[in-house]
């Protein structure tokens, strides 16, 4: 009985925190100071990315505004990397990393920015992309409007090059749709700092110049940066008009590897900044980050305890409790189906084929539940940075 009471308490607490985070927490609007200088560079960490990087470079060349390709810097790790040949072909800079013992995207960005400062080649804005990205022709035109309006950091709208390739890529794309439409849009409407998700964003020199480097080196440097932005009250913007594309994993194994890394990185960041977050809970931005995924964790724990309660009592009334376990499982599956339908409804720009939408509605609940495995693995094993293969796969 006590297990059931604890389960219900956790569920109600989770729902309460969700309501506070989603509907109540609102920060004061910070006045914008317009930027008049907009000399920018493009940074692309690209270890062994010769399969995909040319598509990104060509999309930069094809922008609706003129881009100086000498302001593009591709970061590689080996002088024999074929990526260098593509850089030479398109007349863009390449930088070969020196500190190869430091493995993460954050360290690659640290090295190139420190190199630019040492060379006295300092920019007003630094755009950061993954090598498998492709940019809409108006991406820079739209993003520079954000910078000129005074936003310290802004991210574009992420779409997928291979969203219709299979059900795994479709469900992976829905993960970013969740970040875009249920998180960042809501945060922006309440003047709260958005969540940066890896690529397709700029960071102003107002932030970079404090360190003359890129000081975010944990496994998920993007989430670490997001927490820092909240703590320091920087002004962020989510620009739905600045569209960029990236490639999603095609196999469940690759997806698990990617998402386990995200979970491990999330835990790393929370551990590193926990004390700082507690000190700044009067800042509604930070309070929102403190709540973060806590509602979902509490609700998940509530469900796990409910399953434990049913299993422990199964010997008393086997048929009754087996039925209850089946009903609970079907109820959870149905709720996640409704959640998936909501995501598909809210984000009509994903361009998912009808057949893939049907598959995603049926499969995405399983995809979401597999995060339990990812979180468990992240908690009990040492996850390191592993390369995710990119193959320029398109629909």
Residue ranges and their predicted role:
Residues 22-29, 33-37, 275-288, 316-395:
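Juxtamembrane C-terminal module of membrane proteins
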Residues 58-69:
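Short, acidic, metal-binding catalytic loop of nucleotide-sugar glycosyltransferases
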Residues 82, 129-146:
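Acidic donor-binding/catalytic loop of UDP-sugar-dependent glycosyltransferases
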Residues 1-58:
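N-proximal low-complexity "stem/linker" segments adjacent to membrane-targeting elements
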Residues 38-41, 71, 224:
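Cell-envelope/extracellular polymer assembly enzymes that use nucleotide-activated donors
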């Amino acid at each position: 009985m006590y297990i059931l009471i604890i389960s219900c308490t956790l569920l109600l607490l989770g729902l309460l925190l969700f309501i506070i985070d989603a509907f109540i927490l609102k920060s004061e609007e910070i006045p914008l100071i317009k930027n008049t200088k907009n000399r920018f560079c493009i940074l692309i960490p690209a270890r062994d990315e010769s399969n995909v990087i040319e598509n990104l470079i060509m999309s930069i060349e094809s922008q609706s505004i003129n881009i100086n390709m000498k302001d593009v810097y591709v970061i590689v790790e080996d002088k024999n990397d074929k990526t260098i040949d593509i850089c030479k072909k398109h007349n863009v800079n390449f930088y070969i990393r020196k500190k190869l013992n430091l493995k993460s995207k954050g360290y690659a960005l640290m090295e190139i920015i420190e190199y630019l400062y040492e060379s006295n080649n300092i920019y007003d804005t630094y755009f950061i992309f993954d090598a498998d990205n492709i940019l809409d022709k108006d991406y820079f035109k739209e993003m520079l409007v954000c910078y000129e309006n005074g936003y310290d950091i802004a991210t574009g709208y992420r779409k997928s090059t291979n969203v219709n390739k299979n059900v795994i890529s479709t469900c992976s794309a829905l993960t970013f749709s969740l970040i875009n439409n249920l998180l960042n849009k809501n945060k922006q409407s309440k003047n709260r700092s958005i969540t940066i998700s890896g690529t397709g964003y700029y960071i102003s020199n107002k932030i970079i110049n404090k360190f003359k480097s890129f000081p975010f080196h944990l496994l998920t440097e993007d989430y670490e940066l997001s927490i820092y932005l909240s703590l320091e009250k920087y002004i962020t913007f989510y620009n739905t008009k600045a569209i960029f594309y990236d490639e999603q994993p095609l196999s469940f194994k690759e997806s698990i590897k990617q998402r386990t890394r995200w979970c491990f990185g999330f835990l790393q960041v929370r551990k590193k900044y926990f004390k700082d977050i507690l000190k700044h809970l009067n800042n509604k931005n930070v309070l929102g980050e403190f709540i973060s995924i806590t509602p979902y964790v509490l609700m998940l724990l509530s469900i796990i305890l409910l399953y434990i309660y049913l299993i422990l009592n199964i010997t008393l009334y086997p048929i009754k409790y087996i039925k209850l376990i089946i009903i609970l499982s079907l109820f959870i599956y149905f709720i996640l189906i409704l959640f998936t339908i909501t995501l598909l409804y809210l984000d009509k720009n994903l361009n998912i084929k009808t057949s893939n939408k049907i598959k995603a509605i049926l499969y995405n609940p399983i995809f979401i539940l597999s995060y339990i495995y990812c979180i468990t693995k992240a908690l009990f094993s040492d996850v390191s940075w592993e390369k995710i293969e990119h193959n320029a796969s398109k629909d």
